[in-house]
């Protein structure tokens, strides 16, 4: 539903450019994040998430205005969103009441020894909506059985990152002395001072860049099939996820679309 609202708003904003546009493109594709920042790495190290869990379909549209037979200006909007819930790997949670403490604590999972009261878990959501301006070069022009193109440009990326649920504070280590063996066991507080964690970066804006290439294949009068590869370079500064470097919002995008030529 959110994707539909964003795309409808984008179509409304860009509708005036149809007067000058030569091509309207509607497309669907797959987005593969590049995961090149420490918050991504932390999630994959600590949680039972896989990188493939964050590969997802995306939708978009674009308008092309041809400056010459071989060069066009492009305005485009795409949309990506993925939410995944998972469990911490190798840890169980004990309730504060069980321990006689003020906070829940995470213990290393050891069968028949530390089985826990529950399994600590949280959801991690990423949403990215790029609004991009590109220059597209068609070296062979706009006519032919195959119409290849390359290009690139700049964009404004609207994005959200959200974590909701349990957070184990591995930076705050305590020592639990096992009464049976006398062994010292490192343990960690869960959501200290709160029932759950709710960390959000809402409706943030960042500037990014992209490169693209593809091919258009005529299939009917005024209609071509488009296959496109796009790579986005973008990182967003985090404010509420304290201690983390800028978040990698970039990735690879493979899409298929239909072009209507005006």
PLM regions and their residue ranges:
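Predominantly the C-terminal beta-signal and adjacent terminal strand-loop region
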Residues: 48, 101, 211, 216-262
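Residues on the lipid-exposed face of transmembrane beta-strands in outer-membrane beta-barrel proteins
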Residues: 30, 61-65, 77, 131-139, ...
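Cleavable N-terminal export/targeting peptides
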Residues: 1-23
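Short glycine/proline- and aromatic-enriched beta-strand/turn motifs that initiate or cap beta-hairpins
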Residues: 20-65, 259-261
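Extracellular/periplasm-exposed beta-strand and loop segments of Gram-negative cell-envelope proteins
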Residues: 34-54, 81-129, 157-206, 234-251
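Hydrophobic core residues within well-ordered beta-strands of beta-rich domains
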Residues: 57, 71, 129-131, 148, ...
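Repeated loop/turn-to-beta-strand initiation elements of outer-membrane beta-barrel proteins
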Residues: 24, 70-73, 143, 221-225
């Amino acid at each position: 539903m959110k994707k539909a609202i964003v795309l409808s708003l984008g179509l409304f904003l860009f509708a005036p450019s149809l007067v000058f546009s030569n091509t309207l493109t509607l497309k669907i594709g797959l987005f593969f994040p590049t995961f090149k920042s420490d918050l991504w790495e932390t999630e994959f190290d600590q949680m039972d998430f896989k990188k493939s869990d964050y590969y997802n379909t995306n939708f978009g549209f674009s308008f092309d205005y041809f400056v010459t037979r071989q060069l066009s200006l492009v305005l485009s909007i795409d949309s990506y969103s993925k939410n995944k819930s998972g469990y911490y790997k190798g840890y169980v949670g004990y309730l504060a009441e069980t321990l006689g403490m003020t906070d829940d604590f995470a213990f290393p999972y050891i069968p028949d020894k530390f089985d826990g009261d529950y399994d600590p878990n949280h959801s991690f959501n990423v949403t990215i909506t790029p609004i991009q301006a590109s220059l597209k070069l068609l070296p062979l022009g706009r006519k032919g059985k195959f119409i290849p193109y390359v290009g690139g440009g700049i964009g404004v990326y609207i994005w959200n990152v959200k974590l909701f649920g349990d957070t184990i504070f591995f930076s705050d280590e305590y020592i639990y002395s096992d009464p049976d063996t006398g062994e010292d066991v490192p343990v960690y507080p869960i959501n200290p001072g709160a029932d759950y964690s709710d960390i959000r970066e809402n409706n943030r804006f960042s500037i990014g860049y992209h490169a693209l290439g593809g091919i258009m294949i005529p299939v009917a009068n005024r209609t071509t099939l488009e296959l496109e590869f796009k790579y986005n370079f973008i990182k967003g500064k985090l404010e509420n996820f304290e201690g983390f470097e800028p978040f990698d919002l970039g990735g690879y995008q493979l899409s298929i679309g239909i072009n209507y030529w005006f």
